[in-house]
Regions:
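Long, low-complexity intrinsically disordered regions
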Residues: 1-229
């Protein structure tokens, strides 16, 4: 059996496994609010809309789906692209505090993507500004947003125009997407508009790493460098 040596202590694979499960609150259900649990986990994978409900039910004593649904409906929790630009569920506080930490990662992904190459030669900041206006009118699907933007940039691909917004602007999916027992197309708006507060322009990598360590333990180096890997 392979072992890891840390500060003179030999940890078995089972000990490491138990430590991870304990950090993840998976050794037994505990009494806590869904909001506090989401923050402890530094967000929850939500690419599949109902997966956070299962994750919270697994961890929390007496959890009911309407508790999370209420957090989403009252804008205390939101769904947005974060780690690896996949959809995560986070509290409103963490959305506003963390989103800027991942922007360098999104910028590099955009520059090397086919979507980014399609928009070479135009002012992408103007695309973002126009998209913000459209989303303030009402939340939009990406297909709708792409068609609206193409009216101004008719020689550009609608998907590339819409994905510029996904990569370069903090946006959130709005309910009923993500509500237990309901289904809807992903519909988006500005995080700042939805939450009524600005996204932080400067946040602490160190604080995020410490929270990650509390929830997951020691990660690979690249994982501990959000926005830089």
């Amino acid at each position: 059996m392979s072992r890891t040596r840390t500060s003179g202590t030999v940890l078995s694979q089972r000990a490491l496994n138990r430590a991870l499960l304990a950090r993840q609150h998976l050794l037994g259900r505990r009494k806590a609010s869904a909001e506090k649990e989401i923050e402890h986990l530094v967000g929850m994978q939500a690419q599949v809309p109902n997966s956070p409900y299962v994750g919270l039910w697994t961890r929390l004593e007496g959890f009911q789906p309407n508790e999370l649904a209420e957090l989403i409906n009252t804008r205390r929790a939101v769904r947005l692209g974060l780690m690896r630009n996949t959809i995560h569920l986070v509290t409103a506080r963490d959305c506003l505090a963390q989103r800027s930490l991942y922007q360098p990662l999104f910028d590099r992904a955009w520059q090397t993507s086919s979507f980014g190459r399609n928009l070479v030669g135009i002012d992408v900041s103007a695309v973002i500004a126009q998209a913000t206006v459209f989303m303030k009118e009402r939340p939009r699907t990406f297909s709708e947003l792409g068609r609206l933007l193409q009216q101004r940039w008719p020689d550009r691909d609608t998907t590339a125009l819409a994905y510029a917004v996904r990569y370069l602007l903090p946006i959130v999916q709005v309910p009923p997407r993500g509500i237990w027992g309901k289904s809807a197309q992903p519909t988006w708006t500005s995080a700042e508009f939805w939450l009524g507060r600005p996204v932080a322009t400067k946040s602490s990598h160190d604080k995020l790493v410490l929270r990650y360590l509390a929830a997951f333990g020691r990660p690979p180096l690249a994982t501990s460098r959000p926005g830089r890997d």
